[in-house]
Amino acid sequence: MPEPAKFAPAPKKGSKKAVTKAQKKDGKKRKRSRKESYSIYVYKVLKRVHPDTGIWCKAMGIMNSFLNDIFERIAGEASRLAHYNKRSTITSRRSRRPCACCCPASWPSTPCPRAPRRSPSTPAPSESLPGPGARSLPPSLPPRVAGCFVSKGSFQGHLTTSVKESFLCCQSQLMFLASRLVNFRRAHNTKHR
């Protein structure tokens, strides 16, 4: 008696076996591209303010695009400020002015931690970042702690990593945003019930 043909059962429509990762022709898996975002910082601040509250992925995308937009506005305003004063760099003390111009009126009054001052024994931020991906200032310009290197020829502001870190250290602003987002979410949830 001939044996019946054995077929593998077809995967169900919604099963995970049917969905496979995209592969190249030679059989290697594609690497996932890395995307930088502020989502981990927003999440940390949210958990510090409201430990029992979570955030949706779409809301995190909104917060991420908001922070990118604010950061670009501050960089552009800092570039204009340096151009008006005929300077190639701005110090950490002068970086509060662009923040006051770009942010809402209530933000500059909230307490903001000052940038740490560099002692002679600690290296400058451009010297302390090892690796090929580290950005450093041109050798003709002195490195500034929490400063901003702005090319005079263009209005594009190239911020050093110390400015980015000091921007992320302003947790009072992020806490304010996280609490506003939580209040909006609570109000939105109560409307639809």
UniProtKB/Swiss-Prot annotation:
Protein localization: Nucleus; Chromosome
Recorded superkingdom: Eukaryota
N6-glutaryllysine PTM positions: K17, K35, K44, K47
Segments of skewed composition (Low complexity): 1-12
Entry keyword set: Acetylation, Chromosome, DNA-binding, Hydroxylation, Isopeptide bond, Methylation, Nucleosome core, Nucleus, Phosphoprotein, Ubl conjugation
Residues modified as N6-crotonyllysine: K6, K12, K13, K16, K17, K21, K24, K35
Modified residues (N-acetylproline): P2
Modified residues (N6-methyllysine): K47
List of residues that carry N6-succinyllysine: K35
Residue(s) carrying N6-(beta-hydroxybutyryl)lysine: K6, K12, K17, K21, K35, K86
Residues carrying N6,N6,N6-trimethyllysine: K86
Cross-link for Glycyl lysine isopeptide (Lys-Gly) (interchain with G-Cter in ubiquitin), residue positions: K35
Cross-link (Glycyl lysine isopeptide (Lys-Gly) (interchain with G-Cter in SUMO2)): K6, K21
Residue numbers bearing the Omega-N-methylarginine modification: R87, R93
GO molecular function: DNA binding; protein heterodimerization activity; structural constituent of chromatin
GO cellular component assignments: nucleosome; nucleus
Modified residues (N6-acetyllysine): K6, K12, K13, K16, K17, K21, K24, K86
Family to which the UniProt record says this protein belongs: Belongs to the histone H2B family.
Role this protein plays: Core component of nucleosome. Nucleosomes wrap and compact DNA into chromatin, limiting DNA accessibility to the cellular machineries which require DNA as a template. Histones thereby play a central role in transcription regulation, DNA repair, DNA replication and chromosomal stability. DNA accessibility is regulated via a complex set of post-translational modifications of histones, also called histone code, and nucleosome remodeling.
Further remarks about this protein from its record: The mouse orthologous protein seems not to exist.
Assembly with partners or alone: The nucleosome is a histone octamer containing two molecules each of H2A, H2B, H3 and H4 assembled in one H3-H4 heterotetramer and two H2A-H2B heterodimers. The octamer wraps approximately 147 bp of DNA.
The name this protein goes by in its record: Putative histone H2B type 2-C
Species this protein is from: Homo sapiens (Human)
Upper lineage: Eukaryota, Metazoa, Chordata, Craniata, Vertebrata
